[in-house]
Structure formats: C-alpha cells, structure tokens
Amino acid sequence: ISSHVTIDFLKRNRPGKSVYLVGNSNLTGDFIKAGITLTDENPDIVIVGFDTEMTYEKLNKACNFIAQGKEYIATHPDVNCPLKDGFMPDVGSFIALIKASTGREPDLVMGKPYAYTVDYVTNRIGCKREEVAFVGNE
C-alpha cells in the first residue's frame, strides 16, 4: 500500500515534478502507470522504495541527488521484509545506508503509521481515523 500512498501524495502535492526512483520493476511500473515522470537526470524528488533489483549505480545516483539537496521521500520505514525463511533488507535499511553516506534522513516517510497513510486509507474505505487499526510486519 505504501507505493499507492506515495503515488497519491505526489499527484496531489507535487504534480508535474520529476522523480528519480529507487525501486524494483513492479514499483517502477506502478509509477509509470500513474503518470509520474521518472528521470535519471536532475530530478525534483528522489523516492526510495522497495528494490529487490538494487544496483550500486542506482544507490550512487540516489545518494548524489540527495546530497545535492533534492527532496527525499521514502515509501515506508520498514527495516526488514519478512520471508518464509527469514527476512530481506527493506527500505528502512536503505534509509540508514543513505544517511551514513549523505547525512540526510528522508524529508518525508510514507507507509504506516504516518498520517498521510492513515488519511489515504480512511478516505479510501470511508471511515474515521479512530475506526482504523494498522497491523505491521515489524
């Protein structure tokens, strides 16, 4: 859901802004389908999302753009993604690595339990904030 929340945020609050996306092909496809402009050169915003296809080149570009002061948004803060036989590093791990390299935390983090995500869910299902409970995997 965090990818949908991030896309919704961009469309409502950053229309027309270009994005450098750190994300796997599924996430990239979602952003393209939503009409988000993706670029490898001089983006307005860097989005760091779930990426099982991470490369050093992607990471290096993201760190350089973030160090230059580009707006930096993470799709969610989870450090690990649970698997049947353990876990794999998730976006929160990328956030820690990027902070070690650039000294910056994300300007905005989506996903649970952040307010924009709660509002997105309550608006989609038509209920009040106090009627919703989120269950996480961390």
Regions found by a protein language model. Give the residues of each.
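Structural motif
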Residues: 20-21, 45-49, 73, 135
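Histidine/lysine/aspartate-rich catalytic loop segments that bind and position anionic ligands
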Residues: 70-101
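Short, well-ordered secondary-structure micro-motifs
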Residues: 32, 59, 83-87, 120-122
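Active-site phosphate-binding/coordination module
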Residues: 1-39
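Short, well-ordered secondary-structure micro-motifs within conserved domains or adaptor modules
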Residues: 40-57
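Active-site phosphate/pyrophosphate- and oxyanion-stabilizing loops and adjacent acidic/basic residues
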Residues: 8, 96, 119
